[in-house]
């Protein structure tokens, strides 16, 4: 009589990089014969992959851990908040194990201790697909090219959680991308803590892919990915000089004309306190140059308002910079002190909460007007759209200007499409964030 199949529940919180970590753990568990189940009550054990970037993320992680304990009782914690084991056990002393980010083997071992794999299990090739277990829809996938970060931004604790930059060999990255494309993926989203720095730690060493030499560097990686016939989107790009090298690839249609660059602020004084590159005037000139080379370029960014020491003058400088930059997609966060962040030791005057809220609201209104005007320019134009979902009201997709989850949507008036379809549409209407379209 065979033993029952061990069942694992999994909750993945935080950023796409954490999602990729979850996929890796789940792939290993599936290879060992575990079944992944969608409910707490059906699971023999629950793994919670946490986020610990800001206080609100930690609070969410603790809440989900508590929910899993209440509903199941057997909980293993991993991920970025796992580096603060005391903070987790102080609130939830009954968790079975706590591991940090990238500690895949420790997570799997902890699962083994709670519910061992089936001894008679013999992994078959068809049990786990070649691309591994994916938590995204079939038509797009995140491609993580490195771990860690060499920056020391004063508001951030990522290096203390995920360590210094460690780039994956370019041959491994490209082989994974090939497997994803063969499995039906039509959009690869390149992610890391710092995509522009890819290969710095390896001194851009030459690796091999399909028998051909390829340097472990962002430009060469992008050139190789562009040969796979799918959308390639770059995230978490720092505005180093080497970013200039990929703009011509975008202009030539080899990469999506999309850059996700976290500028964080524009005031030189605030950028210096943040320990960020403080060349906002040169950045504006570079944005102008990029758009001259690639007029279709979409730039997404994130900003922080209310950083300690930020004055009304600094904030107004940021608004004026946004007017000049005319960014397409923008997110904004109110500064939240993070335990262990160097910013706590700067001795700068904290910005009152009500002032942070006021600046956030003004920032969002300011950028909303910019976004609405830029999207209005697309009305009447034809673009390609990748369909994400279809319901009774029509299809919802994204253009090259829209990353999943964080950017806008294109609503297509058609009930004949399915997720993963790429279609050509004509834009008929726009608001502050989204577009409406009809099939061409």
UniProtKB/Swiss-Prot annotation:
Catalytic activity: L-aspartate(89)-[ribosomal protein uS12]-hydrogen + (sulfur carrier)-SH + AH2 + 2 S-adenosyl-L-methionine = 3-methylsulfanyl-L-aspartate(89)-[ribosomal protein uS12]-hydrogen + (sulfur carrier)-H + 5'-deoxyadenosine + L-methionine + A + S-adenosyl-L-homocysteine + 2 H(+)
Domain TRAM: 376-440
Keyword Cytoplasm applies: yes
Pfam families, sorted: Radical_SAM, TRAM_2, UPF0004
Gene name per UniProt: rimO
Protein species of origin: Pseudomonas aeruginosa (strain ATCC 15692 / DSM 22644 / CIP 104116 / JCM 14847 / LMG 12228 / 1C / PRS 101 / PAO1)
Keyword Transmembrane helix recorded: no
EC supergroup of this enzyme: transferase
Cofactor(s), names only, from the UniProt record: [4Fe-4S] cluster
Identification of the protein by name: Ribosomal protein uS12 methylthiotransferase RimO
